[in-house]
Swiss-Prot record:
It comes from Rattus norvegicus (Rat). Pfam families: Tetraspanin. It is found in: Cell membrane; Basolateral cell membrane. The gene is Cd81. Disulfide bonds join C156-C190, C157-C175. Binds cholesterol in a cavity lined by the transmembrane spans. Homodimer. Part of a complex composed of CD19, CR2/CD21, CD81 and IFITM1/CD225 in the membrane of mature B cells. Interacts (via the second extracellular domain) with CD19; this interaction is initiated early during biosynthesis in the ER and enables trafficking of only properly folded CD19. Part of a complex that includes MHC class II/HLA-DR molecules and IFITM1. Interacts with IFITM1. Interacts with IFITM2 and IFITM3. Part of integrin-tetraspanin complex composed of CD9, CD81, beta-1 and beta-2 integrins in the membrane of monocyte/macrophages. One of its GO terms (molecular function) is cholesterol binding. One of its GO terms (cellular component) is basal plasma membrane. Keywords: Adaptive immunity, Cell membrane, Disulfide bond, Immunity, Lipid-binding, Membrane, Transmembrane, Transmembrane helix. This is CD81 antigen. Residues 1-12, 85-89, 225-236 are cytoplasmic.
């Protein structure tokens, strides 16, 4: 015997929420793939300074997002099918998956909040090391190539310290052609550009995580209510 009345409304409401959840998983998967192949970040994070590669923490987070998006699409499909079939087993499995996903998202959110500035900090340190080598050693061709890639990709020149800014003025060959004047150099600080590049992407990820968390809470409530309704209807 199928569910009736308010429980039937909850059934279709849960189906709609799960469809939205499935779509959200697809969006997160798409955004993660876009972030993974974004030309600016790819260019910078594939650089190597001697034997030292650029920091890879950002990509670790992206790979986690790709996995989360794929799992969300699977769980969303499971919830849709379980709601339509009125299966307590599928709904129970769906609820368990949601709880695990929610716990992982909370843990990842806490870690991300604590380390939100670490990615940009690591990239800035990598840039400063390359800039220092390029300025101190005329034969440091690898370091010069790394610095030029940063400057051309982000359209900046030098860091925010007076020393590196002064040396950058003396090394116009390392800077974009539009940044030859001292006034322009003051405006085009590479540390600031690095912060803008990564903070914007992290805010985008944070907003998506909050939206998904709200949907998951509603789905957990609705799935339990529907599961109880199915159990009660089978008694009668």
């Amino acid at each position: 015997m199928g569910v009736e009345g308010c429980t039937k409304c909850i059934k279709y409401l849960l189906f709609v929420f799960n469809f939205v959840f499935w779509l959200a998983g697809g969006v997160i998967l798409g955004v993660a793939l876009w972030l993974r192949h974004d030309p600016q970040t790819t260019t910078l994070l594939y650089l190597e300074l001697g034997d030292k590669p650029a920091p890879s923490t950002f990509y670790v987070g992206i790979y986690i997002l790709i996995a989360v998006g794929a799992v969300m699409m699977f769980v969303g499909f499971l919830g849709c099918y379980g709601a339509i079939q009125e299966s307590q087993c599928l709904l129970g499995t769906f609820f368990t998956c949601l709880v695990i996903l929610f716990a992982c998202e909370v843990a990842a959110g806490i870690w991300g909040f604590v380390n939100k500035d670490q990615i940009a900090k690591d990239v800035k340190q990598f840039y400063d090391q390359a800039l220092q080598q390029a300025v101190m050693d005329d034969d440091a061709n690898n370091a010069k190539a790394v610095v030029k890639t940063f400057h051309e990709t982000l359209n900046c020149c030098g860091s925010n310290t007076l020393t590196t800014l002064t040396t950058a003025v003396l090394r116009n060959s390392l800077c974009p052609s539009s940044s030859n004047s001292f006034t322009q150099l003051l405006k085009e600080d590479c540390h600031q550009k690095i912060d803008e590049l990564f903070s914007g992407k992290l805010y985008l990820i944070g907003i998506a995580a909050i939206v998904v968390a709200v949907i998951m809470i509603f789905e957990m409530i609705l799935s339990m209510v529907l599961c109880c309704g199915i159990r009660n209807s089978s008694v009668y």
